[in-house]
Regions:
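A helix-coil-helix interface module used to build multimeric assemblies
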Residues: 2-118
Length: 118
C-alpha cells in the first residue's frame, strides 16, 4: 500500500519500540549514555583530550603547550554540548555526510575567534 500516511511525519514523534515508548520514563537516564547525542559528546571529549595530550607532549611538530585557559576552553566544548550543539552537529553532518568529520568541524567552529583558531 503506497497511500498510507507517513508515520515518521506525525508529531509528537512515534516511538520505535516499547523502550522509547511506554518505558521512556524508566529508561530516560540512559539517554545520557546510550543516545546518539551522548555518543557525539563522547567523541568531542576524546578529540579534545587527544588534542590536549598532543600539545602537552609536543608529539606533533609545530604544536605548543596550551595555557590553562585554552585547556578550559577546549574542555568546555563537550561539557557545553546542549540541544543547540546537537542541532548544529546534525547540520554539519548533513553537509559532510560523515559523523566523525562533523565532530572535527564542530570543534573548529568552537575555536573560531580564539587563540586556538587556525
Amino acid at each position: 500500500v503506497t497511500d498510507w500516511t507517513p508515520l515518521a511525519e506525525i508529531s509528537p514523534p512515534i516511538a520505535l519500540g516499547p523502550l522509547d515508548g511506554r518505558y521512556r520514563r524508566t529508561v530516560a537516564p540512559l539517554v545520557d549514555y546510550l543516545s546518539e547525542p551522548a555518543l557525539n559528546r563522547q567523541r568531542l571529549h576524546v578529540e579534545v583530550e587527544w588534542f590536549i595530550h598532543l600539545c602537552a607532549t609536543n608529539a606533533v611538530p609545530g604544536t605548543r603547550a596550551l595555557t590553562a585557559d585554552e585547556v578550559a576552553l577546549l574542555r568546555a566544548i563537550p561539557a557545553d554540548f546542549d540541544a543547540d550543539g546537537i542541532a548544529e552537529h546534525a547540520e554539519i553532518e548533513r553537509e559532510t555526510i560523515h559523523d566523525v568529520k562533523a565532530i572535527e568541524y564542530f570543534i573548529k567552529r568552537r575555536l573560531t575567534g580564539t587563540s586556538l583558531e587556525g
